[in-house]
From Swiss-Prot:
The lineage of its organism: Bacteria, Bacillati, Actinomycetota, Actinomycetes, Frankiales. It is an enzyme of class 7 (translocase). The keyword Endoplasmic reticulum does not apply. F-type ATPases have 2 components, CF(1) - the catalytic core - and CF(0) - the membrane proton channel. CF(1) has five subunits: alpha(3), beta(3), gamma(1), delta(1), epsilon(1). CF(0) has three main subunits: a(1), b(2) and c(9-12). The alpha and beta chains form an alternating ring which encloses part of the gamma chain. CF(1) is attached to CF(0) by a central stalk formed by the gamma and epsilon chains, while a peripheral stalk is formed by the delta and b chains. It is found in: Cell membrane. It catalyses: ATP + H2O + 4 H(+)(in) = ADP + phosphate + 5 H(+)(out). Gene3D superfamilies: 2.40.30.20, ATP synthase alpha/beta chain, C-terminal domain (1.20.150.20), P-loop containing nucleotide triphosphate hydrolases (3.40.50.300). This is ATP synthase subunit alpha.
Length: 552
């Protein structure tokens, strides 16, 4: 039996080889905390003293949480996901990452959750990078004035409360007054710009659904898909059954996706539907985290909640690429009270508001825009010259009409001027009515409003105004296409175009038939008389003899 001998040199070489092959990169420091209290989508965690504000924490099972309250000894965390399996005593680990979402063109045509994860069953999304949710808005020197129009396709808005690229225009009104429809029509109206392939015209859209029913979100997606608008739109969905944390971060996730395009020199549009539900979710989170309540139980920083979100909408300077992000926040009022806390906050932040009134909606005026309380602080700077020239008197005429309409309800006798004003106002209201999901191109809007403000439809019965408008616009497109081309080409309404418009509407009136079967123009123009057919007669004139002085 041979004896086993161990040489010290072999042991030394083996140890040296092992030490040389050891990789120390896998070693690191990991902070581990524990759940102290959990419930209602909130967890209080202790043992993570180096956690940052808005840092993501990882619970057992891979559920993420957002650190909002950094207190002495514990952290108040909002759970982003299913909280049923989180129990007291479970381990919680730091991720060292601030909340961010993936961004890029791969999100166009997709439906994602507030963390950027696809929920439409169409597979993974190839992202171009990530963008933090909490980023500083563009500074004053990084912006430029809003001066490029963003057409909504809605006559009442483009004429009276114009929206420009980089503007923040609030859509406010009671429930079921058409707020979402206005926003969806604006997205659909960008379809022709997208089809043009011109990056300076294309507008990429983001629709953020906050606290809505899943069936409603599905309906919006179907509407966009049927209209061919989903190809350039991203839907960020935080339905009503999602935790409050998702509803809180959804608008920031949508704006991060849109800001990626803005900072790349492109144009984007984002719709927040609606911020009232985000404020309610933030109120619930703040109360559960035991933050001091203020007016209507909202926390003291609820103004900052919306201001830091909406200030991200901007028209960037040319040095930064000239990109833009236009925001359409939606706020729901109760009993048309626009003086409530959240509505007044958002009104003071935005560049104007479109107020939709339930009374007008119930009267069949759709979109139900209240002209008196709707305003755009950008105004004519975001309008083409053609639209500005025809829409100048529209707001004044409608405001006077509403005032006279209320006065005439008392049964008072009115003079002819007042009756004429009422008649024209009723026809203007009919002209501004518009079917759902059928935005008008800008050239058709200009011709329609020109016909109304110049009194060309004053002789058309109110019941026939909308049919007259539709058929006349089609007639111009067939027989006077040069009018549309001139409006689109120069952006102006020159004297030659107005002259051709007068000829076109006069010719169309001669062939238009009212709903009762009678022609609009009752008598055809009389043909000139043939001189040979005129019979000349001489009439004898008998003069009395002159009187003499003797006869006097």
């Amino acid at each position: 039996m041979t004896e086993l001998s161990i040489r010290p040199e072999e042991i030394r070489d083996a140890l040296r080889e092992y030490v040389d092959s050891f990789q120390a990169t896998s070693a690191g420091r990991e902070e581990v905390g524990r759940v102290v209290v959990t419930g209602d989508g909130i967890a209080r965690v202790e043992g993570l003293p180096h956690t940052m504000t808005n840092e993501l924490l990882e619970f057992s099972g891979g559920v993420l949480g957002l650190a909002l309250n950094l207190e002495i000894g514990e952290i108040g965390t909002v759970i982003l996901g299913e909280a049923e399996h989180i129990e007291e005593g479970q381990e919680v680990r730091r991720t060292g990452e601030i909340l961010a979402v993936p961004v890029g063109d791969g999100f166009l045509g997709r439906v994602v959750d507030p963390l950027g994860r696809p929920i439409d069953g169409l597979g993974e999304i190839q992202a171009e990078g990530t963008r933090a949710l909490e980023l500083q808005a563009p500074t004053v020197v990084q912006r430029q004035p809003v001066k490029e129009p963003l057409q909504t396709g809605i006559k009442a808005i483009d004429a009276m409360t114009a929206i420009g690229r980089g503007q923040r225009q609030l859509i406010i009104g009671d429930r079921q007054t058409g707020k979402t429809t206005v926003a969806i029509d604006t997205i659909i109206n960008q379809r022709d710009n997208w089809a043009s392939g011109d990056p300076s015209k294309q507008v990429k859209c983001v629709y953020v659904a906050i606290g809505q029913k899943k069936s409603t979100i599905r309906e919006v997606v179907n509407t966009l898909e049927e209209a061919g608008a989903l190809a350039y739109t991203t839907v960020v969905a935080a339905p009503a059954d999602e935790p409050a944390g998702f509803k809180y971060i959804a608008p920031y996730a949508g704006s991060a996706i849109a800001q990626h395009w803005m900072y790349n020199g492109q144009h984007a549009l984002i719709v927040f539907d609606d911020l009232s539900k985000q404020a309610e979710a933030y109120r619930a989170i703040s109360l559960l985290l035991r933050r001091p309540p203020g007016r209507e139980a909202y926390p003291g920083d609820v103004f900052y909640l919306h201001s830091r979100l909406l200030e991200r909408c901007a028209k960037l300077s040319d040095e930064l690429g000239g990109g833009s992000l236009t925001g359409l926040p939606i706020i729901e009022t109760k009993a048309s009270d626009i003086s409530a806390y959240i509505p007044t906050n958002v009104i003071s932040i935005t560049d104007g508001q479109i107020f939709l009134e339930s009374d007008l909606f119930n009267q069949g005026v759709r979109p139900a825009i209240n002209v008196g309380t709707s305003v755009s602080r950008v105004g004519g700077s975001a309008q083409t010259k053609a639209m500005k020239s025809v829409a100048g008197r529209l707001r004044l005429d409608l405001a006077q009409y509403r005032e006279l309409e209320a006065f005439s309800a008392f049964g008072s006798d009115l003079d002819k001027a007042s009756r004429d004003q009422l008649a024209r106002g009723a026809r203007l209201v009919e002209l501004l009515k518009q079917p759902q999901n059928q935005p008008y191109p800008i050239e058709r809007q200009v011709v329609s409003i020109w016909a109304g403000t110049t009194g060309k439809v004053d002789d058309v019965p109110v019941a026939d105004v909308r049919r007259f408008e539709s058929e006349f616009l089609d007639y111009v497109g067939r027989s006077h296409r040069g009018i549309y081309d001139a409006i689109l080409g120069s952006g102006k309404l020159g004297d030659d175009v107005i002259q051709e418009l007068n000829s076109a509407i006069a010719a169309f009136k001669n062939q238009f038939t009212l709903s009762d079967g009678k022609p609009l123009v009752n008598e055809a123009a009389a043909s000139p008389l043939d001189p040979s057919a005129v019979r000349k007669e001489s009439i004898p004139v008998h003069r009395a003899p002159a009187r003499t002085d003797d006869e006097g």
